[in-house]
Amino acid sequence: MANSLLQSTYTCPLCGLQQAKPVGAHIRQQHGEEAFVQAVASAKRAGMSDAQIGEQFGITFKQLERIITKAVGVNVSTLSKPKRIKSWEPTDFRLENTTVWSFKQRGNWATHDGRYRGNWSPYIPRNLILRYTKPGDLVLDPFVGGGTTAVEAKLLGRRCIARDINPASVEMTLRNLRFNLPRTLFEESHIYEPEVSIGDARHLEGIADNSVDLICAHPPYAGIISYTSGVEGDLSQLDVPEFLREMRQVASECYRVLKPGSKCAVLIGDARQRKHVIPIGFHTIGVFLEAGFHLKELVIKRQHNCRTTGFWADRSLEHNFLLLAHEYLPIFEKPAGASPYRAPLLSSTIVELHDTPKVSEPETTTVWVFPCEDLERKMYANLYQRYGGENNLTLIRVTVQDTQPGTQDHHVDIQTSLQQVLPQARQGGFVILEVRDVRFDGYVLPLAKMTIDTLQGIPQLWLKEIIVVLPDDLPTSSNTEELQIVHRYLLVYEVTA
């Protein structure tokens, strides 16, 4: 949070002292650390914005998050009284039918309000519950947070087990479940009160094998947002390797309790370090596949209308990085029987980029949306403007010709293609692979993930961006139960040697 030039004096809320600089240091020195934490929390409760708090106390947004988490026990965006319920369901709701989900509003029906930082939109569990369960089925959320999934399960007549390792999150969930449904609206549905308790997703004690019909999980990202003030077992406090190691236990437990043929959905995103992406999402997908799951769908959760302007747009162009604007929602299935792995047979084509027009407003986030009839021209123009020129850009399109029973044959095919272009690639240049997920035998082959896994063994390539490209006019209906795959990926690698 940058200090504003509009405020010339700052007043200590504890002793009334006025000074020409933020009062945070004064409060800590004269009144103590605990008084400082409570003063910040009081300002938050009074409705002061994050920017105003940052200016008043001289703290960053990250510091504010840690202070609120310490004061309240859970990371929330506002400290307010329970909301007044104005509606019990979303208006004009329809099931999503493509692999890109984006919601204009976060969702504020029932007790949903989005105060819990990192909570997912209630549209996500509503879609999952309605698509993959029937009334009376059992839904499990092992990272319940503010209770979004539990509230939706109660509204939709499903049984629910809701657990979280943070006691403050459990208390918040219980508060959000304190409502009585009007029988005039729900007279045909049986209402089940969710079973809410403190619990560790790595050890789902008390839940029988093969007993759950749907798992909805939104685990804390490794080191992205602090969800607790130091609760033992909080995955958000771990670095990426530790996070993935603990998620293996989570995946194993989810596999154990899920019924064969049932679904497990996990919302997860990526991180960034040194202006390069860390593919936590694809690594997490790999963890669940190793546990025995099959990938039924791979949804891109897009931030709606996320287009940067001003400061962040300038920073994106100046330092050549894209702002993360998407997450992954892999929907796994516990197989009901044997289904042998089928390895994709790949082919690759080098795409020549010539005479690309200059882009007046270059893309600055990881989600690129273009008109369908002009998608490829605008996509290639953005690629060339950001990564081309003298940087020696090479674009390779990877496609699947067929599949065959096997294990890892696709690795050889991709590396063979790269061997043709890497000798000509210059240090500081870029190799970009255009890939799409494909569906075979009812399951999704995550070709982008497979490609990234393969290229980890090539030291001169450093993954810089995972870009998702999609048309602006997505279909609103579908004739199949499967989601229509509408997105593609651009995997941007920097040549380091």
Q: Which residues fall in each region the model found?
A:
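Class I S-adenosyl-L-methionine-dependent methyltransferase catalytic core
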Residues: A2-Q18, P22-E33, V37-A497
